[in-house]
Amino acid sequence: MITASDALERLKEGNQRFLSGVRSIDTIVKQIQRENFVEGQEPFAIILGCSDSRVPAEIIFDQGLGDLFVIRVAGNIVAPSQVGSVEFAAERFGTPLV
């Protein structure tokens, strides 16, 4: 297990690669798409899923950044806060699918 400090550094390095356009993965976000994220988001689906780090919704559904509004919860128990997040996305973004 790595330390919290090492984990934070790893996240910062990954974010820096993303910002500079240098990626270590095959899935690439085009520059024009990244610029569109500044304007807001228009997710086409709301995913309420497991918080298991091995199951990232964007990867398992082969979708890009901004395509999904993902709410992750541990223990398969949906609390009012998660329901509120689903309601927020549906109302704010007009997302048609939960």
How should each PLM-predicted stretch be described?
Residues 11, 47, 71:
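Divalent metal-coordination and catalytic microenvironments
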Residues 18, 53, 79:
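Short, electropositive, low-hydrophobicity segments enriched in small/polar residues
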